[in-house]
């Protein structure tokens, strides 16, 4: 069937169908080809059942040939070119911090919420040394981001994995509990998807944290590079900022996040047996160039340093330390003393066994004296 299909739908026709920078247009073009084949093979049920698989294989072969032999990407970009970028902060007025980051037809909005340290996530796992998690990053990939209407059944393996990658990328730049006594939660909502949503969520989260007044050490950006290989070790093309089609039909998705000064997280998905040292070196170099471009030309012009205060609607926290032997006096008999302070001032007071006292106000712009 494949040979007959290629004779009917020429390689030139398939190349024309996939050569567009609009995902919906490309999908419509491929669907039109499938409809022509369905009409041609209407009397052959066996071949009708194979149309989807055959068109996918033909599309993959065409895209790989365009990239490897012609050095031409499906959306017309140069091998090293990044898709159009856009960033903004304070998209949502009522939240503690928000930001939007867009790369081509991939768009991510991240919302930051701040809370007291007592609201950190409690962990019940094998590692007994880690019982709480102060920074939480959640990644949501709703069906509407790819133009579908399937029901949401909670986070899957993909959402959990992408959220964990973005979380690891940002943890190295977060302030300590002493510097910033807050629990921090970021939620990345994928508004539109055409590849590299995990890296987009890293960029959006970095912007959102700075907009929320979290004193991060440096902004973090993420980028993915792809790979298409030929017959020999030297026959390959590395693609900067891969879109969905290049991810599906390529051999690698190499994700790198970091600051101007270094890398904070790496993840590689690979479909071939291995990589040469030259490929690895070039891939890391490409991500460095792209990261510098994103940070310098897109993110930093929007917000270059964290705001010097948390937002109007974020809780205000004052931290102090007392002698652990005095904790019982602060609490009082059956909590009488501490509850009286809470009732009088309207604040929340958290005391741990080491004598750290966090006074949290959700209603006052400044903390009352207690």
Name what the model sees in each region:
Residues 363-369:
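Conserved small/polar residues in nucleotide/adenosyl-binding loops
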Residues 91, 116, 142-147, 167-180, ...:
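Conserved helix-loop functional segments at active or binding sites
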Residues 91, 96-182, 262-272, 276-281:
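Glycine-rich, flexible beta-strand/loop modules in the N-terminal catalytic cores of phosphate-handling
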Residues 2-130, 315-329, 337, 343-345:
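Extended amphipathic alpha-helical scaffolds
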Residues 353-362:
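Short glycine/threonine-rich beta-strand-turn micro-motifs
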Residues 1-11, 212-304:
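Mobile "lid/hinge" segments at catalytic clefts and subdomain interfaces of large enzymes
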Residues 294-320, 365:
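Long, charged amphipathic helices and adjacent flexible linkers at domain junctions
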Residues 8-16, 186-188, 192, 264-271, ...:
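Short, hydrophobic beta-strand segments
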């Amino acid at each position: 069937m494949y040979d007959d299909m290629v004779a009917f739908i020429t390689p030139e026709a398939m190349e024309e169908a996939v050569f567009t920078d609009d995902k919906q247009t490309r999908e419509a073009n491929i669907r039109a080809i499938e409809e022509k084949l369905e009409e041609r093979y209407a009397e052959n049920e066996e071949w009708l059942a194979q149309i989807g698989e055959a068109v996918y294989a033909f599309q993959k072969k065409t895209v790989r040939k365009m990239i490897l032999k012609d050095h031409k990407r499906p959306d017309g970009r140069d091998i090293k070119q990044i898709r159009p970028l856009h960033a903004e902060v304070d998209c949502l007025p009522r939240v503690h911090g928000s930001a939007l980051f867009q790369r081509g037809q991939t768009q991510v909005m991240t919302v930051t919420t701040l809370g007291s340290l007592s609201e950190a996530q409690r962990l019940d796992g094998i590692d007994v040394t880690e019982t709480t998690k102060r920074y939480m990053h959640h990644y949501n990939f709703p069906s509407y981001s790819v133009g579908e209407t399937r029901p949401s059944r909670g986070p899957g393996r993909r959402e959990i994995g992408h959220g964990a990658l973005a979380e690891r990328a940002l943890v190295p730049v977060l302030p300590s509990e002493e510097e910033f006594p807050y629990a921090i939660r970021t939620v990345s909502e994928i508004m539109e998807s055409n590849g590299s949503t995990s890296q987009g969520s890293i960029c959006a989260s970095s912007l959102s944290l700075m907009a929320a007044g979290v004193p991060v050490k440096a902004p973090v950006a993420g980028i993915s590079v792809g790979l298409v290989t030929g017959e020999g070790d030297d026959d390959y093309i590395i693609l900067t900022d891969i879109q969905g089609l290049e991810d599906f039909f390529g051999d690698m998705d190499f994700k790198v996040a970091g600051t101007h000064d270094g890398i904070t997280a790496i993840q590689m998905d690979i479909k071939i047996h291995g990589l040469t040292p030259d490929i690895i070196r070039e891939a890391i170099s490409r991500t460095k160039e792209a990261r510098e471009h994103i940070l310098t030309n897109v993110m930093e012009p929007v917000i270059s340093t964290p705001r010097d205060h948390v937002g109007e609607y974020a809780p205000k926290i004052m931290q102090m330390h007392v002698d652990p032997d005095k904790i019982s006096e602060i609490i009082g008999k059956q909590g009488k003393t501490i509850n009286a302070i809470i009732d009088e001032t309207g604040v929340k007071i958290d005391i741990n066994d080491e004598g750290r006292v966090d006074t949290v106000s959700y209603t006052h712009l400044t903390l009352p004296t207690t």
